[in-house]
Amino acid sequence: MTRTSMITMIPKILTISILLTVLAGCALGGYLPLPGEYQIEEGFAIIRTDSLQVAVRPQSYRGGYRDLNNNFFSVYVMVRNVSTEKVKLPMESFSIVSGGRQYDYVDLEYILSSYHQQMVLEQWQDPFNLDPLQPVDQEQNMEDYYELMASYLSFGDLQPGAAKEGYLFYDRNLNRAQELIFDALGIPVTYSKGI
């Protein structure tokens, strides 16, 4: 290699190095399930009962309303009915214990009303601002609103062989916990925060 070609490669190498460092930094700090009475696959704890298979993982909300991650601690849950009969998924099926305190999930109605209030307030921009940098996109806000509704885990009857999946949201103070126990259908799953 000539000296000129080496000099032109330095910015590329630096860019790749920085990108890899950022990606590695994003991967750290997540919650990982500790071994227990469940399987672990791709960060999910997989719990099996006679009639249900449940996969659980603390995970940032990936929908359009990204501010939700600042306001709540989110957990992604997948539930499959492995029996030949209809099974009821009770609303009290999932909770989190951390620091000796139990946290129940936040109702969807509360989250949606909070988001709706934010959308209404965004419409009333500063009247003295002559050059708003970003106009309010009401259509996008409504899409994000409905996407949030659709991605929330629903409870109730689960038909044979059918599955439900979605997010449950908890108190944001759980983001600071080094360890937490997610109770899924009475089976405790311990998660520890990565380094």
Model-derived regions, located:
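Sec-dependent bacterial lipoprotein signal peptides
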Residues: 1-26
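Conserved functional micro-motifs across diverse proteins
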Residues: 26-195
